[in-house]
Amino acid sequence: MITVVKIGGHVLDDEALLGRFCKDFIALAGTKLLVHGGGALAGDVQKALGIEPQMVEGRRVTDADTLRVVTMVYSGWCNKRLVALLQSLGCNAIGLSGCDAGCITSAVRPPRVLADGKTKVDYGFVGDVRPSSIDTRFVRNILGMGLVPVFSAINHDGRGQLLNTNADTVASSIAAALGARLVCCFEKEGVLSDVDDPSSVIPFIDSAEFERLKASGTVAGGMLPKLENAFAALRQGVPEVILKSASGLLSRGGTKICL
């Protein structure tokens, strides 16, 4: 079975952790591909350029200047750094975005009303991806050549417009399109019931528990899109979704998501 691994959070900023993750990723049995974010670095670059990052419910509002920044950071530095590191460890990785070979197309996200029922947000140049937007023939051909795709979260609308897409959405859509298992790796051991206690990992979360965790504020910020995409992946036929630490890719543990 194919495994789609998504890496994000602060892992990309931790050289030692990233190095261990890449070694474990290479050792992971079976066919696999990698999807990555890069939001922390993108935020730093924005601030250095005098652009204030705007986040709403864990998702980045992307105006024209922000789009330039995230494209440079995600498809440039982050993607090529990961590919170079994997290549140095003997993994024949190839860096890709959704624009390459038109393999992932996105639709501009329409303005949305937030959970409060009042606030309307225009996310700007942000794209939504569906499993039907993935060119599975292209992805399978790349995998069949013995290459390991490393996808950034920059896609396009097919008409020349670049779009910023949440990396968790890209990973869940690719997994659904390929019928692959999905493993989302970040700096925590899993979803925590107490953010100040790294050992408070919730082993299983179903839909009802997710709603309870949202209502209590236990799950908020960047964890919201992670879990929303995890449940979307399961509803679209992904056989298994696990959220876990990047340092424990090959071990048991983490949080298993169930419908």
Describe the predicted segments one by one.
Residues 1-259:
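C-terminal catalytic "cap/lid" subdomain
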